[in-house]
């Protein structure tokens, strides 16, 4: 006899199997959600950035998140950390192509410039923003999915544009109210100058093989410049005394670097020359720079860039000079929080309270008319679909951040009026601002006049 038959024979009811709740799924480690509470701060940064980029005449470009892997191998450099161990790459099961989630934005912007012949009528100033992906250990300020803002000045050779892209960053820091962000500067010269320096640098580093860490040993003969960028405390003295690339620069490279410095000084931009600053990508030449803060711990670089004149030709385009920068948006958002310059979250203009079937219909009509006039309106809706009391709705209106509550009940519908209550006049007596009865047809004009008056 089965268990259910035993239960039935005993006169008991059949027991339904206990259903376990499904386990909640979570996001991928290092790939974070941006929640509604964070949105105003992101929008604040994005609005400031867009305004700055417009002020300098930059145009937006958007490229795919997925590119051919070879784009980054050729563009970033085969022996860089990004290409060797940080890229999310996969084989397309449909056609066998090797594809990669973009780890940075410059290579794709240059690819698009070449593919669409954007330089046919002269130099271009372009900017981009979006998510990038690197397979690394997540920590504060370093994520597997992160967001970049970048600017690329393509077709410009002079030190004036190097200086201008640095000034752009300073203007953004000023607009965001950020202080204590310092600029470090260096020149990587040209390829033949780096080759002469590389030869001497390898000879120097070979004398320290007994203390080099694994990363430095791996880079010794493939990318020795990156050894100078080591964060290992035991190697700092060695790196500080290494041959300096700036001592190998010829007249033209030195003149370019001095031109950049002269323009920065003329615009009152303080900077420090850091001969060990090399950046982590192989496409740079001449000017390189980083903006650094001490308020974010080890991940203190919030923006960096420089000149990359060889890259366009290296990727198959007609040779053209170029320079640019990229900044990590998450790190800047964190710095804004650290410095306490977070803007107040903006509420909507109107919260529409209603009770009764006829009132609900009129409230929706009124909300659409207000939106037609350019106002931001939240129309009350309750979780249970029953509306809720006027008291509970007014609490929602107050916590929404709205400047005004518009109140409609069936009595107001019958009389052809609405009630308008000020919610943000804190100098008024406790309980909020004034309340007025307004003809329904005149609601839009009344609120616009009231809001204009409040802003004067």
Swiss-Prot record:
Its EC number is 6.1.1.21. Gene3D superfamilies: Anticodon-binding domain, Bira Bifunctional Protein, Domain 2. It catalyses: tRNA(His) + L-histidine + ATP = L-histidyl-tRNA(His) + AMP + diphosphate + H(+). One of its GO terms (biological process) is histidyl-tRNA aminoacylation. GO terms for cellular component: cytoplasm. InterPro entries: aa-tRNA-synth_II, aa-tRNA-synth_II/BPL/LPL, Anticodon-bd, Anticodon-bd_dom_sf, His-tRNA-ligase, HisRS-like_core, HisRS/HisZ, HisRS_anticodon. Keywords: Aminoacyl-tRNA synthetase, ATP-binding, Cytoplasm, Ligase, Nucleotide-binding, Protein biosynthesis. It is an enzyme of class 6 (ligase). The keyword Aminoacyl-tRNA synthetase applies. One of its GO terms (molecular function) is ATP binding. Belongs to the class-II aminoacyl-tRNA synthetase family. This is Histidine--tRNA ligase. It comes from Cupriavidus necator (strain ATCC 17699 / DSM 428 / KCTC 22496 / NCIMB 10442 / H16 / Stanier 337). The lineage of its organism: Bacteria, Pseudomonadati, Pseudomonadota, Betaproteobacteria, Burkholderiales. The gene is hisS.
């Amino acid at each position: 006899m089965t268990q259910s038959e035993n239960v039935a024979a005993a006169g008991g009811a059949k027991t339904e199997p206990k259903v376990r709740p499904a386990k909640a799924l979570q996001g991928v480690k290092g790939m974070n959600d941006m929640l509604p509470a964070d949105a105003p701060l992101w929008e604040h940064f994005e609005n400031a950035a867009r305004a700055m980029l417009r002020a300098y005449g930059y145009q937006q470009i958007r490229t795919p998140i997925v590119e051919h892997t070879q784009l980054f191998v050729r563009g970033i450099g085969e022996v860089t950390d990004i290409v060797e161990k940080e890229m999310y790459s996969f084989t397309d099961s449909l056609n066998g192509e090797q594809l990669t989630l973009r780890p940075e934005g410059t290579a794709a912007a240059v690819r698009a410039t070449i593919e669409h012949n954007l330089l046919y009528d002269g130099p271009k100033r372009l900017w981009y923003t979006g998510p990038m992906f690197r397979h690394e250990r997540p920590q504060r300020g370093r994520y597997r999915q992160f967001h970049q803002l970048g600017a690329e000045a393509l077709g410009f050779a002079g030190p004036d544009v190097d200086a201008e892209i640095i000034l752009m960053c300073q203007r953004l820091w000023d607009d965001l109210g950020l202080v204590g962000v310092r600029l470090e500067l260096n020149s990587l010269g040209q390829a033949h100058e780096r080759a002469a320096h590389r030869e001497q640098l390898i000879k120097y580093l070979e004398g320290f093989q007994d203390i080099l860490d694994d990363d430095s040993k791996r880079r010794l003969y493939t990318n020795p410049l990156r050894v100078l960028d080591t964060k290992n405390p035991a190697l700092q003295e060695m790196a500080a005394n290494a041959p300096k690339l700036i001592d190998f620069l010829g007249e033209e490279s030195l003149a370019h670097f001095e031109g950049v410095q002269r323009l920065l000084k003329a615009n009152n931009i303080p900077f420090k020359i850091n001969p060990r600053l090399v950046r982590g990508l192989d496409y740079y030449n001449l000017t390189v720079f980083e903006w650094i803060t001490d308020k974010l711990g080890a991940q203190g670089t919030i923006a960096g860039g420089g000149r990359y004149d060889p890259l366009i030709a290296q990727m198959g385009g007609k040779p053209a000079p170029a320079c640019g920068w990229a900044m990590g948006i998450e790190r800047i958002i964190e710095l804004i929080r650290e410095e306490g310059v977070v803007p107040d979250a903006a509420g909507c203009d109107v919260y529409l309270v209603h009770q009764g079937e006829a009132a609900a219909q009129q409230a929706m009509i009124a909300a659409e008319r207000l939106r037609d006039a350019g106002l931001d309106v939240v129309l009350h809706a309750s979780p249970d679909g029953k509306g809720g009391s006027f008291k509970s709705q007014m609490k929602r209106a107050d916590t929404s951040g709205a400047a005004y509550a518009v109140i409609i009940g069936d009595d107001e519908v019958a009389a052809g009026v609405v009630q308008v209550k000020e919610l943000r006049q804190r100098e008024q007596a406790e309980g909020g601002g004034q309340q007025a009865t307004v003809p329904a047809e005149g609601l839009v004009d009344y609120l616009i006049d009231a809001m204009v008056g409040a802003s004067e």
